[in-house]
Amino acid sequence: MITRRALLGFIAVSSISPVFAADHPSIAFMRRFGKDMLAAHRLGTVGKFAGVIEAYADVAGISNYSLGQYKPNLRANQRSRYYQGVVTFMSRYFAEQSREYRVAKYEIGEASVDANKDVIVASKIYLLSGQTYNVRWKLTWRNGTYKIADAKVMGFSLTYLQRGLFTSYISKRKGDVSQLVAALTR
């Protein structure tokens, strides 16, 4: 026989499930992002991708993370130029990839909360070639809205890969971040 205490305990545990329903704001955010990203993908221009990245990505967070140990070397007067350079870098990457990986459609799956209180949203990307990719999006809360902090494709973090590229570039230039800023803003 189920006791009242057991039933109340089950209800309490069930109500704090880490998986969000389809109407959760993080899912609505990802639906808007998906629609805009697919439109950018179909157009394939750097400018269209830049608009989507500026609207939905945590540009400052991604940019700062990408500097790794060289973050203290970024001067305050370089910051906005660097952030814009990162947007351009990511936009060029996505525009280039859009030619090779033609997306037919996407599905937004469930969202859950990780140990750092970030929201992780699962998605599936369907290519025109018939291939599919699972992408896990990490969302963070910034200035009253969700922002994309990372995407993992086949288990590989895009921000981690970008960090590797940037820190390697800076390392070869003896820690001079201004050379990276100049390269990103050409």
Outline where the language-model segments fall.
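N-terminal secretory signal peptides and thylakoid transit peptides that target proteins
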Residues: M1-A12
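Generic alpha-helical secondary-structure signal
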Residues: F10, Y82-G85, A183
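Sec/Tat signal peptide C-region and signal peptidase I cleavage site
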Residues: S17-A21
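Early exported N-terminus immediately downstream of N-terminal targeting peptides
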Residues: D23-S98
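Juxtamembrane/interface motifs at transmembrane-helix termini
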Residues: G68-K71, E100-K105, S168-I170
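Surface-exposed, charged secondary-structure patches
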Residues: R92-Y133, A183-R186
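Short beta-strand edge/turn micro-motifs at domain boundaries
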Residues: T132-Y160
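Low-complexity, intrinsically disordered terminal/linker segments enriched in charged
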Residues: D150-R186
